[in-house]
């Protein structure tokens, strides 16, 4: 049995996907799994330092890692929706470059998308959970909101832009790639990576078939949100592309990173995917 360190976030959608694995509903006979639970920006940094065998990261952060394959399962794609830029008072697009904008991490895909849209801006990095309060208190002019706050805060603030909708429009309908899971080629054999990918897919499929059971488990990570809101959030980001991204997911990941390279925001050598 192979021991693996598995990084994922304390977020409801990740909890939903890993529910069957974490509770033994889907048995892992090949792997002894050590769960490492951190926020996404911490996982991004740990992946860059190559500290974990398998981990969730932002698509943006993939351009900074080495020797990791992208798993086909477990990715988060927005289907004409995504991270939202909120403000307390209406903001015009031309004002954004001179505004102070709270961001949930420099390596998050949300930050990359905003840079693609408006270019350089005055970003103030903070934990994603602190951003709504920073907007309310006027500590920042606007805030880039991810996770379930995209939904829960939608009536409290002005929506400057929904970056998933913007991406959908400018790409002719592509899903917006936000989070992926990657596996180390240094510490794991290719066959082990493929086997884990299959196992992860089974865990996601189990959750989708046993929605209420998996949601009940996910509520431990709901941060005070209602079950109805978490259900809605999970259904948004655990979709058919999460089960297997397919060629559509591969293309959208490649397109986002290529756009980042074209605008000199990032650079990368190659994008490596796990075999189907």
Descriptions of predicted regions:
Residues 39-41, 50-63, 127-128, 144-151:
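Beta->alpha turn/N-cap motifs
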Residues 2-23, 83-141, 148, 251, ...:
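Bilobed "Venus flytrap"/periplasmic-binding protein-like clamshell domains
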Residues 189-259:
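Secondary-structure end/capping motifs
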Residues 71-93, 169-186:
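Hydrophobic/proline-rich hinge and linker segments of small-molecule sensing/allosteric domains
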Residues 4-5, 67-76, 100:
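A structural signal for short loop-to-beta-strand junctions that line the ligand-binding cleft
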Residues 26-36, 117-130, 266-271:
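A local structural motif
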Residues 13-17, 26-58:
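Extracytoplasmic small-molecule ligand-binding "clamshell" domains
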Residues 129-219:
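Pocket-lining segment of extracytoplasmic ligand-binding domains
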């Amino acid at each position: 049995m192979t021991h693996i360190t598995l990084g994922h976030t304390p977020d409801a959608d990740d909890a939903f996907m890993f529910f069957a694995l974490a509770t033994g509903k889907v048995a892992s006979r090949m792997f002894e799994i050590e769960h490492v639970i951190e926020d996404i920006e911490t996982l991004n940094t740990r992946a860059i330092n190559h500290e974990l065998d398998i981990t969730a990261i932002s698509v943006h952060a993939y351009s900074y890692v080495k020797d990791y394959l992208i798993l086909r399962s477990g990715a988060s794609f927005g289907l004409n929706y995504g991270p939202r830029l909120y403000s307390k008072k209406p903001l015009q697009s031309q004002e954004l470059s001179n505004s102070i904008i709270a961001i949930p991490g420099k390596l998050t895909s949300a930050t990359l998308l905003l840079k693609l849209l408006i270019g350089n801006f005055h970003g103030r990095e903070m934990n994603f959970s602190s951003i709504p309060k920073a907007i309310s208190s006027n500590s920042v002019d606007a805030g880039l909101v991810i996770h379930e706050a995209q939904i829960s805060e939608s009536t409290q603030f002005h929506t400057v832009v929904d970056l998933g909708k913007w991406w959908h429009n400018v790409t002719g309908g592509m899903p917006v790639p936000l989070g992926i899971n990657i596996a180390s080629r240094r510490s794991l054999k290719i066959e082990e990576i493929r086997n884990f990918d299959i196992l992860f897919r089974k865990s996601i499929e189990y959750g989708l078939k046993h929605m209420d059971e998996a949601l009940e488990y996910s509520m431990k990570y709901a941060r005070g949100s209602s079950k109805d809101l978490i259900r809605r959030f999970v259904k948004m980001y655990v979709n058919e592309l999460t089960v297997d991204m397919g060629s559509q997911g591969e293309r959208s990941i490649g397109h986002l990173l290529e756009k980042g390279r074209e605008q000199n925001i990032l650079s990368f050598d190659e994008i490596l995917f796990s075999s189907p």
